[in-house]
């Protein structure tokens, strides 16, 4: 493209949903002829997509804005922290514009005002799958915005609004475009994947000569037709989650669920405004494992929530022992500006919160290590993410990018594996987080057209 094209620097912070917002803005910028540059110095203007979920994210976002202001001086701010424009303008009154999450039009208007486009969108084309910030072989697929829940520790609804589902045919067409562009793994994200379509009354829409409901199970059935890995994130533990487990058992959907349980004490869950039937949760986890023995269940928890007693923390540790989850993330509770949990009595001292967090993670590390050790001697289908010298770094079907473990393929160089390759790996060793093994030689031309037809041993 011409050197005269206006140049935009872009900083993307926050969760995968925010990453999708960034990708949509970047796609529109490229469609309109803007060059995306990797440095502040080379940019005519900088867009910062912020996060504002917890205090540390607010600090990171403000720091990023400040860095861009100091290095460039022309900065447009968007994203979740943009819902608090007074906080941004108090710190940096010279920012050009501030807008909230998924407000793509406002971002583009601000860019146009600061840097008019010099491009005819009918001449230069952008790939129909858009601009991606992830590696080419995987992509996040956002199916909705907002959330109807009012968890006491969370301010997402005040930032992103109530649930607004995308029509199922629109989502499936986007997934098709991504697969045409080389994506081999789709990561379904939202604030509440289980609630998908409830706001649209599960309306039916046509795709590929068939009618699909705007509902989680129907969406999964459609995605399974694309022949790539499909992974579900941010699933709320509703009973109808049971309906998608057979798709996992049949190899049509990755046997993986990311479900944030948050705690195991009924009283704490009630204070969090989360479902509190812990016995039913345990029964459901065991039922999923019976229906699909290969299933991986990942979850997140909050330790040290206001009022959490020693006994309630011990109940949380007992839950880990009983549930035998594969992957777990945990956070020590920290107040979030605007969250109703801030007003709860009996805050847990910071030192005690950190002590409990360490004990919690140590207990789960033992469980995860044992579950990974049990995979030694098995063959796992893996997707290569990175080549480091002679070792290929990959992920198994049990591992989402960034948050889960890795599979280190020792003979990756010998077999000339490439990023994006799907390969069967014999597992020879493990630790608390990762697996190690050797790829089995295969003729790429002989691989089945549907990646999900390969089953783990």
Curated annotation (Swiss-Prot):
Binding site for [4Fe-4S] cluster 1: 15, 51, 80
Example of a GO MF term: protein methylthiotransferase activity
UniProt-listed Enzyme Commission number(s): 2.8.4.4
Binding note for cofactor: Binds 2 [4Fe-4S] clusters. One cluster is coordinated with 3 cysteines and an exchangeable S-adenosyl-L-methionine.
Keyword check for Transferase: yes
Protein name: Ribosomal protein uS12 methylthiotransferase RimO
GO terms for cellular component: cytosol
General function of this protein: Catalyzes the methylthiolation of an aspartic acid residue of ribosomal protein uS12.
UniProt record similarity statement: Belongs to the methylthiotransferase family. RimO subfamily.
Record-listed [4Fe-4S] cluster 2 binding positions: 147, 151, 154
Cofactor(s) the record lists: [4Fe-4S] cluster
Top-rank taxon: Bacteria
């Amino acid at each position: 493209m011409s050197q005269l094209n206006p140049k935009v620097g872009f900083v993307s912070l926050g969760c995968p949903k925010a990453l999708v917002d960034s990708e949509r803005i970047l796609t529109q910028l490229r469609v309109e002829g803007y060059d995306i540059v990797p440095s502040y110095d080379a940019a005519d203007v900088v867009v910062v997509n912020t996060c504002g979920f917890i205090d540390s994210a607010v600090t990171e976002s403000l720091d990023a804005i400040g860095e861009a202001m100091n290095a460039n001086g022309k900065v447009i701010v968007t994203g979740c922290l943009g819902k608090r424009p007074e906080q941004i303008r108090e710190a940096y009154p010279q920012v050009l514009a501030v807008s909230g999450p998924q407000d793509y039009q406002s971002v583009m208007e601000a860019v146009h005002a600061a840097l008019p486009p010099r491009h005819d969108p009918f001449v230069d084309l952008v790939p129909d799958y858009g601009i991606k910030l992830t590696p080419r072989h995987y992509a996040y697929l956002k199916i909705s915005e907002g959330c109807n829940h009012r968890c006491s520790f969370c301010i997402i609804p005040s930032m992103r609004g109530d649930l607004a589902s995308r029509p199922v045919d629109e989502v499936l067409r986007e997934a098709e475009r991504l697969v045409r562009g080389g994506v081999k793994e789709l990561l379904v994200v939202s604030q509440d994947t289980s609630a998908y379509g409830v706001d649209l009354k599960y309306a039916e829409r046509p795709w590929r000569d068939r009618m699909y409901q705007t509902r989680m199970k129907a969406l999964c059935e459609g995605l399974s037709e694309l022949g790539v890995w499909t992974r579900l994130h941010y699933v709320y533990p509703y009973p109808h989650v049971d309906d998608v487990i057979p798709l996992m058992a049949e190899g049509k959907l990755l046997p993986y669920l990311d479900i944030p349980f948050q705690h195991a004490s009924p009283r704490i869950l009630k204070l969090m405004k989360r479902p509190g039937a812990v016995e039913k949760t345990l029964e459901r986890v065991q039922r999923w494992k019976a229906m699909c023995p290969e299933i991986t269940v990942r979850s997140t928890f909050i330790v040290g929530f206001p009022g959490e007693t020693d006994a309630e923390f011990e109940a949380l540790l007992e839950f880990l022992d009983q549930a035998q989850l594969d992957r777990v993330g945990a956070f020590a509770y920290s107040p979030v500006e605007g969250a109703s949990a801030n007003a709860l009595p009996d805050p847990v001292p910071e030192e005690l919160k950190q002590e409990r967090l360490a004990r919690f993670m140590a207990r789960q590390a033992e469980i995860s290590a044992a579950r990974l050790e049990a995979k030694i001697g098995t063959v796992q289908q893996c997707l290569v993410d990175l080549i480091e010298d002679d070792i290929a770094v990959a992920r198994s079907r049990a591992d989402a990018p960034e948050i889960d473990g890795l599979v280190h393929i020792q003979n990756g160089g010998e077999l000339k594996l490439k990023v994006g390759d799907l390969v069967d790996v014999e597992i020879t060793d493990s630790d608390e987080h990762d697996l190690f093994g050797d790829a089995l030689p295969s003729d790429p031309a002989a691989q089945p057209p549907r990646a999900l037809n390969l089953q783990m041993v």
